[in-house]
A protein has these predicted regions:
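Core catalytic region of metal-dependent phosphoesterases/phosphodiesterases
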Residues: 2-6, 11-99
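Active-site-proximal beta-strand elements of phosphoester/diester hydrolases
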Residues: 2-10, 111-118, 185-189
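Active-site environment of divalent metal-dependent phosphoester hydrolases
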Residues: 10-15, 39-41, 66-71, 108, ...
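His/acidic metal-ligating clusters that form di-metal
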Residues: 27, 91-159
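Hydrophobic/aromatic beta-strand patches that form the interior of the parallel beta-sheet core
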Residues: 32, 60-62, 115, 147, ...
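Charged helix-capping and loop-helix junction motifs
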Residues: 45-47, 128-135, 168-169
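Short, conserved loop/helix-junction motifs that constitute active-site signature segments
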Residues: 53-56, 139, 178-180, 206
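Acidic, His/Gly-rich catalytic cores of divalent-metal-dependent hydrolytic chemistry
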Residues: 161-246
Length: 246
């Protein structure tokens, strides 16, 4: 089975559409969404509707911190993020908010764990940024691979049978073999607001038959997404950063 994995879409309809089209062209069998469907971007209704439609057809979706902030507040967010959440609250319908509120923090199937931020304390929204923070998740997990997002930068960590943790930066389009002798923690980057210096949307395909993970980079219409952000009256920085991938 080929599983398409998407995280941090952030109300970017153009990026999500491009990634879904790319995934279909690569003949995926299953879709998994790892949170942060709203915030920053100008198309929250489209993105939530799209994710909800996929869930109704059997896809998995978990909740991210921006989705959570729609109901719980923005005390821990930057000013621009908080402004985007406040605007988003006025865009979503009651049923869309109910959908987001009802999503789980994590989900699992077979030997895979799906979560937005981390494995060891998913409700705390701590970031995985280095070997130490990755090791906490790798120790806490029992699955062969955990897949998450949250930091908007693609990364891959693994733990050996002796407990040694290592990492490397994945290259887009290159199949990565997932040795059964290791535990794996894959950080998927972002569909809707990449921050690794590459403006192309990022998602991944997990092939459980071949036991490979492939990060994908997909160009999309940034001009359209940025124009909508400005037209909505959201902070201009949220539009500008799409071009820089930062």
């Amino acid at each position: 089975m080929r599983i398409a994995l998407f995280s941090d879409i952030h109300a970017n309809a153009e990026a999500l559409t491009a990634c879904l089209d790319h995934a279909r062209a690569n003949e995926v069998d299953r879709y998994v969404f790892l949170g942060d469907y709203v915030g920053y971007g100008a198309d929250p209704k489209f993105v939530v509707d799209t994710v909800q439609a996929h869930v109704s057809r059997g896809a998995i979706a978990v909740r991210g911190n921006h989705d959570d902030a729609i109901e719980t507040g923005t005390d821990q967010m930057t000013e621009s993020a908080a402004r985007a959440i406040a605007w988003t609250r006025g865009q979503l319908t009651p049923s869309q908010r109910t959908f987001l509120r009802g999503l789980p923090l994590s989900a699992s199937e077979a030997d895979r764990l799906y979560v937005h931020a981390n494995v060891d304390a998913p409700a705390g929204w701590d970031y995985i940024t280095d070997l130490y923070t990755a090791s906490r998740s790798l120790i806490a997990m029992r699955a062969h691979i955990a897949l998450c997002g949250h930091i908007h930068v693609p990364a891959l960590y693994h733990m050996s049978p002796t407990g040694k943790v290592a990492s490397f930066e994945p290259i887009g389009g290159i199949d990565i073999p997932l040795s059964r002798h290791r535990r794996w923690l894959a950080v998927l980057g972002a569909v809707g607001q990449p921050r690794d210096g590459d403006s192309a949307a990022c998602y991944a395909i997990l092939d459980d038959a071949r036991e490979t993970l492939t990060y994908m980079r997909v160009p999309y219409d940034i001009d359209s997404a940025a124009r909508k952000i400005r037209a909505a009256g959201l902070p201009a920085r949220l539009a500008d950063r799409l071009y820089a991938g930062r």
